Amino acid sequence: MAPGPAEPPGASSPPPPQTERSRWENGWVWALAVLLPLRLLSAASAPIMDCDETFNYWEPLRYLSYQGSGGGMQTWEYSPTYALRSYLYIELHGLVLRIGRALASLDDVQSFYWLRSGLAVVSAGSEAAFCAATADSLGPRVGALTLAFMAPASGMFHASVALLPSTTCMYCVLLGFAAWLRGRHVLGLMCGSLAVLLAWPFVALAFVPMGLDALRPSALGFAGVVGVAAAAILAFGCLPALFDGWYYATGRPVSAVANLILYNALGQGGGGRGADLYGTEPFSFYVKNLLLNFNLVAPLGLLAGPALAAIPAEGRWRRLLAVSPAYLVLLLFGSMAHKEERFLTPIYPLLCLSAAAVLDTALGVAERGAVAFGLTRRPRARAVCNSLLVLLALAAAALSASRSMALHVNFRAPLRIYEHLYYHAAGPAAPPRAGSVCIGKEWYRFPSSFFLPRWGPGGAVSPLLWLNSSFTGQLPRPFEPWPGGISVVPPHMNDRNEEEPSRYSQLSDCAFVVDLELPQQEEPTLDRAAWEPLACEPFLDAERSRLPWRAFHLPFGISQRRNAYAEYCVWRRKGR
């Protein structure tokens, strides 16, 4: 394949008419105008969906960016004994944080949202480039449908602004596939290498079809692919290993990616169980999550492969090559016992592309059939088809908006509560001394130390303490004092998710307690004679709420009447 858009992978047959092409002459700008406000809205309102984001990324970022003065909790993955996470990956995000703090006087909470907004901008730009490349190479209708499916999708609502390697991989998929669709194989493969070698190695299968396509003599050829691979290994493999070796102070290069593969894929750690220690799920777990995150688009995207193979249309095998990575990644993660919703994040855009491609192909066949049967003089038939497409896109968007609204309304309480606590400490009525913030069973909804109170301008940050609860796994511990916390082997760490009793504090040590009080909880409630609520927010009680009401938000108070809610509160010890 020669470089350029003349014959990209998956190209639709004849080029679209000039009038249709002209609509996408500034396609990237138009797509960005649609996407950027939506992604910034996500940055402001999406809940943190996974405690891994908080403790493995926000917390070390907090520790590094504030050089220990802002606190920060350390997981066992950051112990030099295991070194499953890359400090270089954290520091790259820290650059964005430092730029924001240098440009403006941002407090800790504002710094959190500044970085989230930066992620939103990167996501919107990457998605816009992907949609524009799709329109140029596969046809304007495919590009428009991809944008219509992807922009409002609930999965993109929360995944686009997550501080997670899987989200970084999604950005790389978007930019890499945009380059590939335009015939720029070197750029596409470098994006894939960045994703695999620096962010998350398990996304490698998503770039296999691109690599195979690049092997053709008319593309890069074997020698060209080997050259790109060598440059990528040096830039994204060797240099990060040297950087992390310096941070972990091991005296040798440290490849967090290699350690991650050994632990998760080969089971070398965790008593031989690897990631399975943290729970296993059937394949239906992914089916359910895809339906929740993409509703009508999910079955279309999943059926795209068989449908494209079965429908006789020019260029179908090229389109199959473009959508095949989604199936490879889904099969890989579906075959693994340990499953997480975020594992499928890198293929979210490809799912939207697959759905758009199969609809465009089917309509193209129908249009050619209309020509064959002399029905081209019946514009009503074409208008009906286009109207059905618009209705499908609107229905998918409405369901996605309902789902995203449900996530925001039902699970926004932790961010709001901790934000209230932070600004309470900064207010004139705050007590003159710092107090510890304690969490029991709600540890996994802690949004990060960016929300811990700072008592007075530049004052001390409240310590975060754990209270014993029904949870019996291993909790994070505070980093050692700066700068030793990066390289010192912390005590009482294990890779088997075994409970460490040394983590727990007593209620008497607490000035504030954050808790969700549920009717069915095992833990005792706080003594009202000693504690008073500082702030409370409603939080969905999932066990007492039924589908579909808890999964989708309906207006006019319908969801509130159908669902059960509990109070998510920050409690203050009386007398403070």
Map each language-model feature to its residues.
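Membrane-interface transmembrane helices that cradle and orient dolichyl/undecaprenyl
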Residues: 174-187, 195
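Transmembrane-helix motifs of polytopic, lipid-linked glycan transferases
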Residues: 113-142
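Extracytosolic helix-loop segments that constitute the early lumenal/periplasmic catalytic or substrate-binding loops
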Residues: 38-40, 56-84, 88-91, 95-103
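Short acidic/glycine- and proline-prone juxtamembrane loop motifs at membrane-interface regions
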Residues: 50-51, 158-168, 341
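Short helix- or helix-capping micro-motifs
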Residues: 146-154, 192, 196
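Start-transfer (signal-anchor) and selected internal transmembrane alpha helices
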Residues: 1-39, 228-235
